[in-house]
Each structure stands twice: as C-alpha cells, then as structure tokens.
C-alpha cells in the first residue's frame, strides 16, 4: 500500500512539473501533420471542378462525403451538400455564371461498395442552396457537360443501375436548365452511358461512350455487344 501511495504521489508531482514547463513550437518541429478527422471519411474523390476566372474556387465530389467547396485553392474546404445524397458522381460549373453548379449524385465507380444517388441537383448561389432537377431513377451519374455558349443546355451521362437491368440508362439532354430532360442516346437496358465529351470549338459535336456492364455479389461483367463509341454533329439529334 505504501508503494502504491508513493507511486501516486510521484505521478502527481511529475504532472505538476510538466504543467509548469514552457513548450515552444520547436519542441514538436519534427512531427509531421496528419489527418485526425472527421471520423466519417469522405471516401474516394469522384469529381473535381474549378472556376476558370477564379482559380482558388474549387468543388470536389466524393464517394461518400458529398460535395466540398474551397475558396483557398484547396488549403481549406467546407461541406456544402450535407442535406443531400452523399454519393457524388459528377460536377459541372457554368463558367459564364460560376455561382451555378450542377451535381450528379451516385458515383460511377462500379464497385460492390458504391452507394446510389437520387438524380441531378443544381445550385445558383455557389452551393449555399440546392434544388433537385430530375433524373431521380438514374442511381449513378458519370459525367455532366455544359454548353459553353448556353448554360441552360446540359448533357448528362447515366450508366444506370449496378445490379439490374434499367430503362433509365443512357445519355440525357436538357435545354431549359434542368426543368425537362430528353433521352437522346440509348442502346438497351444493360448498357449505360459512361462518358461524354464536347468539341470546345463546336458544342454541337459530341462523343459518347456506351458501356455494357453488370455487377453481381461475387463477379463483374464489363463490356458486351452494347458497348460502343458514338458521335453526333448536331447536338445529339443524330448519332
């Protein structure tokens, strides 16, 4: 018992002495900074978009942590999408009106651990507020491309459901800022749109890749007769 009391007394004296010791920043100079939070990870980075005229403004989409915004070129970030589906597949910014941001929910990395989304969302105030603007049954969105001459015209690539056939796969277009959508390229229920690019000199020229795939609990089938590359020279009217 005496030894126990002596140990406690020595510990208290040591703590008191440590509390009075002055610690300078050089004491910890050799320790490298490391991430200690938040506890809930954001997951994979699935999309990054920046504002051309204001390079310090960035939006980052994640597989499980929503959308984050930086106004310091990536030194600091704040979450701006906490009330909405946290799985994000694509982001696009209207460079003529950079406060207008489009987000497609549901990441397109077709792993067996992905989460689904709930369609397209849009903000007109730099991420402060969001409205859902359609494609609710898409589940996974891989790309958003905006017409640089008309911010109301957008193309959205939808791979579609991971585990089953779906008629909601394909390439969609809106000409009214997301109020209405038209499916402009569709192969079959097994094949979705994986990617789309636009000729920066002529926004009517598009290339779209269609991808046939299917995930099962223990396997993944990638490719098939539905997979192909398509080109349009009239804004998606013909392919």
What is the role of each PLM region?
Residues 1-21:
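Bacterial Sec-dependent N-terminal signal peptides
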Residues 20-239:
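Beta-propeller blade termini and top-face loops
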